[in-house]
Amino acid sequence: MKEFKSFYKEVKGNEGSKCLYNKRLDTYGCGCQHDCSYCYAKSLLDFRKLWNAKTPAVASLDRIEKKIERLPVGTVVRLGGMTDCFQPIEKQERVTRGTIMLLNKYGIHYLIVTKSDLIVEYMDILDKELAHIQISTTWIPAEKAVSTERRIQAIETLYDAGFDVSVRLSPYIPQYVDFERLNSIRCNKIIVEFLRVNHWIRKWLPLDYSEYTLKQSGYCHLPLVKKIEYLAMVTGFEELSVCEDVDAHYLYWKDIVNHNKEDCCNLRMKEE
C-alpha cells in the first residue's frame, strides 16, 4: 500500500482566510473510495493523474503522531478535508481510529467531516469535549457512499448520545434534496455549503447549470439571491450556518444568517 506523506496541511489563500479551522489532516490521500462526482479535490487531482479512487494512499500513524505532538493543546484539526477519513478502506487500515486516539492523548480538538456511518462504531473512543462531527447528507443518485438514510441514522445516534454533531448539507443542490426528510432530522445544527462548479464537475455531474452564473476563483456559483431563496427551504434546525467561498456572500451569511458569526462551523467549544 502506497504511503500518503502529505497528510497535514495548513490551508492558505481564499479558503484559508474564511475557514477558522485551516489545519487539515487526511488519513488517506490521492484518492477516495467514495469518488463523488461533485468532489473538488477529485477535480483538482484527477486530470493530473494523481487520483486513485480504488486504492488511496495511507498515512503513517508514526508520522501522524510526530505532527500531532507538536500542536498546541486546544488546536482544532479537520479530519477529512480532501478525502473522507471514514471511507471503506478505514475498516481494514484503521488509521483514522489510531489518529483519533492520538488526538485525544494530546488534547487536540478534531472536526470530522464524513459521508459514512462507520463513525458510530467509534463512539467508544470519541471524546465529547474534543470531537466535533459533521455528517454530509446528499440525495445525489449513484453515490458510492452509504445511503443517506444510514447517514441520518448516524447523525441521530450521535446527537442522542450528546456529541457535538451537525448535519452538513454539502453540496446543497436543491434539485437533489428530499426536503421532508432533511427537515425532520433529529439534530439541532445544520451547515449548508452550496455547490461550486468547474469544468470537471460539469462533466461528471448531470445537472442544469444555467443558474450558476457568478464566477470567482475558477468556479461558477449561484448568485446570492438564488442562494437566499434556496436556503429558505431548509427549516427545522435551531442553529443554521453557511460555509461560503464567495467573498461578498461570505460577509452576508456572517452578518445576517450564521448562528455563530465568528465560526461558521459553529463548533461547541468550551473555554480553555
Where are these regions (language model features)?
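C-terminal accessory extensions appended to soluble enzyme cores
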Residues: 198-272
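Compositionally biased, intrinsically disordered low-complexity regions enriched in proline and serine
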Residues: 9, 39-41, 123, 160, ...
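A broad, structural surface signal
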Residues: 34-37, 101, 233
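Pocket-edge structural micro-motifs
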Residues: 29, 40, 80-81, 135, ...
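N-terminal [4Fe-4S]-dependent radical SAM core
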Residues: 1-67, 72-76
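Short linear sequence elements within intrinsically disordered, low-complexity coil regions
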Residues: 43, 177, 255-258
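Conserved AdoMet/S-adenosylmethionine-binding subsite of the radical SAM
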Residues: 64-231
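The N-terminal extracellular segments of secreted preproproteins, especially immediately downstream
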Residues: 18, 31, 186, 263-264
